[in-house]
C-alpha cells in the first residue's frame, strides 16, 4: 500500500497529528461512477500548500478530524474517506485553485439533500487553514439521483395540466409585496390574470402577517383565479406561498390550497429548508399541485465569488429535492446573472443530460436519468422592452415574470398584463417566422405597438430603464492575457 493511501488501521494506531495530505490527497485515484464529485474553489491561508488545503477539505467534509483517533482502526478508512484527486490553478488568481474531491456514495443517506449538504458544505467552511472556500459544482451519480423523486410533476406534465404550449409562460408578482389587504390583493390578481397572464404570484415574504392572513389571501386569490378563467377560457393560477414558521403550518396551507382546487403553491426553499421542501414536494406530487420555488436568501450563499456555494449547486439540489419552477435570474434585469453562467444552470434545471462545459461554468457531465425538469423563472426588473431578449435567452420552457413591469403600467393592472402578453406573442411569432430576436427585437416590439395601445403605452414608460451593472459572478479568465488583448 502506497504511503499516500495508507489507512491508520493498516499501520497501527499512533496518537498525534499528521498532515492531511498523507491520507486524503490521492492524485492517482480513479473516480468511480458511484462517487459524488465536487469542485471547490480553495483560498488557503499563507503558508498552507495546495495539496494540504485540498486534502483538508476532503478530510473535514468526510471522515477526518484534526488528530488521529483510535476508532479509525474499527472501520475501513479507504472505503469511506473523501479524496482530493486533483488540483488546478484558477486563471488570473495567484492564491486560488480548484480542488476536486470524490466522496464514496455510502457516506450519504438516500434521498436526503439535507444530509448531503451537511457533509459537503458543513463545518469545513469554517476551517481556519482556509481563507475562503466555495463549492463550484457537484456531479451527482445516477445511483444517487435515482433515490430522489425530484420535481412533483415536471415541465411536460405542467404544460398538459395548463394546456399551454409553444411559448414561455407569463407571470406577475403582486406589488406592493407587503401591506395590501386580502381583498385588494385578490383584485390585483384578477386584473392581471384577466389581462392575459398565466400566473400571478405571492412575493417571497408574503406568509401570514397581521395585514393579510394566509387563509383570507388564499380565498380571495382562488376567487380571482376562477373568475379570470371563466372570462378568458384559459387555465390560470396564483402561486400561493405555503411557507410558514413550522412544517405543520406549511402542510396545513398546502392542504387548504388543494381543497380550493387551485393548480399551484409556492415555497421559499432556502429559508424554509430542504427537509421541509422535500416534504412539500412529495405532498404536491401525491395531490396534483404544481410547486413554485423562490430562492430567497440565495445571494447570501452564492454571490461572493471566492466563498459560499454557486447557484448551479443550489439548482441541482432543488431539482433533487423537488420543485416545478425556480427563480434563475434574468441576465437583463435588476438581479445578478451573467449570460453564459445563467444558461449553464438553466440547462442543468431543464435537460436530461448535460455535458461538461467550462465555458458555461459546468465542471462535470451530469446525467439526470429521466428525473423531471424544472422551469426556470426569469424575474426581477424586467419590462416589455426585455421581452425579445428573454424569449431568445430562455426559450419556450420558462416562466417570464413581470411584477412592476405589469402593475406599473400607466393605465392599470389589466392593460399592463395585455401589454406583456402582446409583446410575448409578437416575439414568439417573429421567432417562428425566422426573425432574429437578438438583432430585431426592438423593431418587433415597435411593430406590435401599432395594433396594441396598451403595449405602446408600456413602451413609452419604460423606454429608458436599464440595469447595466457588471455581474459579480463571472467566468474565470487570465487577467494578464485580458489586459494584453
From Swiss-Prot:
Binding note for cofactor: Binds 1 Mg(2+) ion per subunit.
Q: Which UniProt keywords apply?
A: Acetylation, Calvin cycle, Carbon dioxide fixation, Chloroplast, Disulfide bond, Lyase, Magnesium, Metal-binding, Methylation, Monooxygenase, Oxidoreductase, Photorespiration, Photosynthesis, Plastid
The record, for Pfam families, names: RuBisCO_large, RuBisCO_large_N
In-chain residues carrying the UniProt-annotated modification N-acetylproline: 3
The active site consists of 175, 294
Describe the processing and modification events after translation: The disulfide bond which can form in the large chain dimeric partners within the hexadecamer appears to be associated with oxidative stress and protein turnover.
Report residue numbers covered by any propeptide. Answer: 1-2
Location of the protein in the cell: Plastid, Chloroplast
Site described as Transition state stabilizer, located at 334
Q: What is its main location?
A: plastid
GO cellular component term, pick one: chloroplast
Residues engaged in binding Mg(2+): 201, 203-204
- Transferase as a keyword? no
The EC number(s) given in the record are: 4.1.1.39
* Keyword flag Transcription regulation: no
To which protein family does this belong?
A: Belongs to the RuBisCO large chain family. Type I subfamily.
Q: What is this protein called?
A: Ribulose bisphosphate carboxylase large chain
Q: Which organism is it from?
A: Helianthus annuus
Amino acid at each position: 500500500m502506497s504511503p499516500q493511501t495508507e489507512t491508520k488501521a493498516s499501520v497501527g494506531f499512533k496518537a498525534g497529528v499528521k498532515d492531511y495530505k498523507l491520507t486524503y490527497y490521492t492524485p492517482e485515484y480513479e473516480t468511480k461512477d458511484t462517487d459524488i464529485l465536487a469542485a471547490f474553489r480553495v483560498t488557503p491561508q499563507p503558508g498552507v500548500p495546495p495539496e494540504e488545503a485540498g486534502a483538508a477539505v476532503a478530510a473535514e467534509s468526510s471522515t477526518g478530524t484534526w488528530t488521529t483517533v483510535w476508532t479509525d482502526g474499527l472501520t475501513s478508512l479507504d472505503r469511506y474517506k473523501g479524496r482530493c484527486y486533483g488540483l488546478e490553478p484558477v486563471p488570473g488568481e495567484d492564491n486560488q485553485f480548484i480542488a476536486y474531491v470524490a466522496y464514496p456514495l455510502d457516506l450519504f443517506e438516500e434521498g436526503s439533500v439535507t444530509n448531503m449538504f451537511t457533509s459537503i458544505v458543513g463545518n469545513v467552511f469554517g476551517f481556519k487553514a482556509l481563507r475562503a472556500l466555495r463549492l463550484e459544482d457537484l456531479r451527482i451519480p445516477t445511483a444517487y439521483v435515482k433515490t430522489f423523486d425530484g420535481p412533483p410533476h415536471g415541465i411536460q406534465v405542467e404544460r398538459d395540466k395548463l394546456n399551454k404550449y409553444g411559448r414561455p409562460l407569463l407571470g406577475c408578482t403582486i406589488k406592493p409585496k407587503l401591506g395590501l389587504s386580502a381583498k385588494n390583493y385578490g383584485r390585483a390578481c384578477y386584473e392581471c390574470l384577466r389581462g392575459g397572464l398565466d400566473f400571478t404570484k405571492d412575493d417571497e415574504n408574503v406568509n401570514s402577517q397581521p395585514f393579510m392572513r394566509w387563509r383570507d389571501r388564499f380565498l380571495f386569490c382562488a376567487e380571482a383565479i376562477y373568475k379570470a378563467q371563466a372570462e378568458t377560457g384559459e387555465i390560470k393560477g396564483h402561486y400561493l406561498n405555503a411557507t410558514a414558521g413550522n412544517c405543520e403550518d406549511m402542510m396545513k396551507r398546502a392542504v387548504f390550497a388543494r381543497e380550493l382546487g387551485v393548480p399551484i403553491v409556492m415555497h421559499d426553499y432556502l429559508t424554509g429548508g430542504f427537509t421541509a421542501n422535500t416534504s412539500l414536494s412529495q405532498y404536491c406530487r401525491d395531490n396534483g399541485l404544481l410547486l413554485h420555488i423562490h430562492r430567497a436568501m440565495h445571494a447570501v450563499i452564492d454571490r461572493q465569488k471566492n466563498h459560499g456555494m454557486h447557484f448551479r449547486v443550489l439548482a441541482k439540489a432543488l431539482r433533487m429535492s423537488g420543485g416545478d419552477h425556480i427563480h434563475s435570474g434574468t441576465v437583463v434585469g435588476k438581479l445578478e446573472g451573467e449570460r453564459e453562467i445563467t444558461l449553464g444552470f438553466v440547462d442543468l434545471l431543464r435537460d436530461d443530460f448535460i455535458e461538461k462545459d467550462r465555458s458555461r461554468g459546468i465542471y462535470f457531465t451530469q446525467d439526470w436519468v429521466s428525473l423531471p425538469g424544472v422551469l426556470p423563472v426569469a424575474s426581477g426588473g424586467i419590462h416589455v422592452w426585455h421581452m425579445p431578449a428573454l424569449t431568445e435567452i430562455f426559450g419556450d420552457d420558462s416562466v417570464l415574470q413581470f411584477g412592476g413591469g405589469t402593475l406599473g403600467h400607466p393605465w392599470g393592472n389589466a392593460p399592463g398584463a395585455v401589454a406583456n402578453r402582446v409583446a410575448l406573442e409578437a416575439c414568439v411569432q417573429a421567432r417562428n417566422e425566422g426573425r432574429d430576436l437578438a438583432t430585431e427585437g426592438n423593431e418587433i416590439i415597435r411593430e406590435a405597438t401599432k395594433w396594441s395601445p396598451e403595449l405602446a403605452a408600456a413602451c413609452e414608460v419604460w423606454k429608458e430603464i436599464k440595469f447595466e451593472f457588471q455581474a459579480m459572478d463571472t467566468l474565470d479568465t487570465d487577467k494578464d492575457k485580458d489586459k494584453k488583448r
